[in-house]
Amino acid sequence: MVTYVSALFYGFGGIVVAGVALLVAFQEKLVYVPVLPGLSKSYPITPARLNLIYEDIWLQSSDGVRLHAWFIKMFPECRGPTILFFQENAGNIAHRLEMVRIMIQKLKCNVFMLSYRGYGASEGYPSQQGIIKDAQAALDHLSGRTDIDTSRIVVFGRSLGGAVGAVLTKNNPDKVSALILENTFTSILDMAGVLLPFLKWFIGGSGTKSLKLLNFVVRSPWKTIDAIAEIKQPVLFLSGLQDEMVPPFHMKMLYAKAAARNPQCTFVEFPSGMHMDTWLSGGEVYWKTNLQFLEKYAPEKRKEDTGR
């Protein structure tokens, strides 16, 4: 009996040790997936394929990494709001072009699509601190442009992009007018137990019962729950209730954390929305929700205001 129990104990311990070793060695490959299986790192299409007016933008992050982006306008002199768009963790910005094409039509906006370092045509390798620098470089570029209304820059982020957007919005209260989060997680620490269930006993955020013994090994914790609590700008939360990747209660927790300090928070649920298709399954309600938010919190300047 003792031998059996000992074998069971050591067997379980071996599994945990092996799992932790894999986490330490390959965690970036779990969090950041620039290349989808069976596809190449390059863009399968460009905005030109969808007859969109765009610029190829090359930026340099503060640590010297060369970044690529697309700046897409509804028409050359569009002075509507500008959406700074942050994608999920997998694939590249070309895979979001169809959604962005509809976004431009429905919201009458410009869209700036950034390729994180290591994604698409951008150089370097993805990391949390690196991507935070990349996002700042994109915002600084937009803030310095003279062909857009820089008082109407709104950050949009889905999943990982929401974590990126939350940090950027928190750090730039004078440059970002509002934030839109869609199907975003509370933290990678909380997601570890979702992706690898045995890790929930060892890795977790402040709101979990995890022992948190291994939190220190996570190099990209992306604590959205902490960033959201410090944001003073308006925030729209878009939650797909059929999200198969990020449990929908993550969005509810983010909203509760934000709304406790920020009265300009709006939470909208989409009953049939999954992780990637909430914008599609939500139909006109989805776009109307976004449009109303922009009209309220990133409104067009009145002529008397611009004349002052």
From Swiss-Prot:
Compartments, record wording: Cell membrane
Entry's transmembrane regions: 6-26
Disrupted gene: phenotype observed: No visible phenotype under normal growth conditions, but mutant seedlings exhibit enhanced root wavy growth and curvature in response to gravitropism and phototropism.
Enzyme Commission numbers on file: 3.-.-.-
Gene3D superfamilies for this protein: alpha/beta hydrolase
Major subcellular location class: membrane
One of the GO BP terms on file: proteolysis
Listed GO MF terms: palmitoyl-(protein) hydrolase activity; serine-type peptidase activity
Pfam families: Peptidase_S9 (PF00326)
Membrane topology: Single-pass membrane protein
Keyword presence, Cell membrane: yes
Catalytic residue positions: S159, D243, R308
GO cellular component, one term: plasma membrane
Protein origin, superkingdom: Eukaryota
Class in the EC hierarchy, top level: hydrolase
Alphabetical UniProt keywords: Cell membrane, Hydrolase, Membrane, Transmembrane, Transmembrane helix
Reported tissue expression: Expressed in roots, rosette leaves, stems and flowers.
InterPro entries in the cross-refs: AB_hydrolase_fold, Peptidase_S9_cat
Family: Belongs to the serine esterase family.
Function of the protein: Involved in the regulation of root growth. Involved in the suppression of the root bending in response to touch stimuli, gravity and light. Negatively regulates stimulus-induced root bending through inhibition of root tip rotation.
Name listed for the protein in its UniProt record: Alpha/beta hydrolase domain-containing protein WAV2
Provenance organism: Arabidopsis thaliana
